[in-house]
Amino acid sequence: MTTPADFASPAVDESSPRYDGWRVTAVCFVVAMFCWGFGLYSHGIYLAELQRLFGWSTSLISGATTAYYLLTASLVVFISDAIVQLGPRRVFLLGTCCLGSAVTLLAFIVAPWQLYLVYLIMAVGSAAMHVGAITNVLGLWFDRRRGLAISLALNGASSGGIFVAPTLIVAIAETGFAAAMVGAATVMAAILVPAITIWIDQPPIRTETTGVSAPQGGSRSGSASTVPRCTRLEALQSLAFWSVAGPFALALMAQVGFFVHQIAFLEPAIGRTQAGLTVALLTAMAIVGRLALGVSLLRLDLRRVTALSLLSQAAALLAMTQTTNAAVLFVACAIFGLSAGNLVSLPALIIQREFEATSFGMLVGLSTAIGQFTYAFGPGLLGVVRDATGGYGAAFALCIMLQLAAAGAVQMSRPQRKPIDLR
């Protein structure tokens, strides 16, 4: 009698450089670079240019940015379902189309309502290319090397701050806002569409459970064993799940708040040019931190790594508030950046290690959504505290308190039993 084992493919060698999953990782790197480049690091550029062109208030434009973050968070919750129903290639192509359309349309808006509409389109694109989508897609190709693949792919997020945003600034100065935005969207489409079409294919057949359901319609590992064993409601009612989602939501609120206010805080002390260089240094160090985590992942206690990362960021922020010395500020930004990228990667890595495998995709999407819902309010909250107190001391003290609380929570709430079954 024929058994399922008769149809199983040979064991997948994820360590081989020829393994197709590494090409998928490269595509995810570029996806992350454009997603974060246009969807996070360039929002300050959009704000400055729209104010220059139309004289719109900061609160009006910031309101559109907050709406963008909140809608993205709402959609990320369901990204694992979208990948199952549509497949990774279609999801990434949909994201590229929406993000590219939004970047292009920003060049032609003339009214505030159009800005909000464009940001809603951008949110759809961002959700389909964000960390939840990338970790779910990589979960289809990787099991043992999933942590390394995620760390490598999400280095693209930091690269968006190093390459995409600065290039956009130069292009706007040379050609104007409209031409630069259309050109940037064209370049993104020219790179991503063929790369996704050629290299994002069906994942390999596996005899083991990877924790991410394969797309429907293909003869892949989409058996009943890969259906999530718990629901989103059960996850939200679980203290074990919140021991991951809660601390990282607080940590990212502080981190994203600092990102948005970094130049405004540093410019009076070291000038605009050097303040801009601290952004490049921070994002470069984020890449170094991710690579270091990726190569040593299997030997590390990830919750302890998270706690130490948050303590180092808190110390860096404290140092920044106590000096105007340029060298000290650069060193503090480098220390802060060393952990910045890992705080995006670590939730998925902890979930993979601690929770039952079949719920990986759903739990990562839900955790990502909670984090984004929370950090959407970070920049505004810091702005309110700064305006109320007349400086950034109290605002950064709030960030430090959030980071210390997150460090304590993630370390003290570690589960006793693994893998965790939430049902």
Regions found by a protein language model. Give the residues of each.
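Extracytoplasmic
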Residues: 23-58, 76-79, 165, 257-263
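Extracytoplasmic gate region of multi-pass secondary transporters
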Residues: 43-47, 236-288
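Intracellular juxtamembrane helix-capping segments at the cytosolic ends
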Residues: 50, 128-142, 342-355
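Helix-to-loop junctions at the C-terminal end of transmembrane segments
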Residues: 75-88, 290-301, 386
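C-terminal ends and interior cores of transmembrane alpha-helices
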Residues: 97-110, 312-324
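Cytoplasmic helix-loop-helix junction between adjacent transmembrane helices
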Residues: 120-155
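Helix-loop-helix hairpin linking two adjacent transmembrane segments in secondary transporters
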Residues: 157-204
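C-terminal transmembrane helical hairpin of 12-TM major facilitator-type secondary transporters
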Residues: 282-286, 292, 299-350
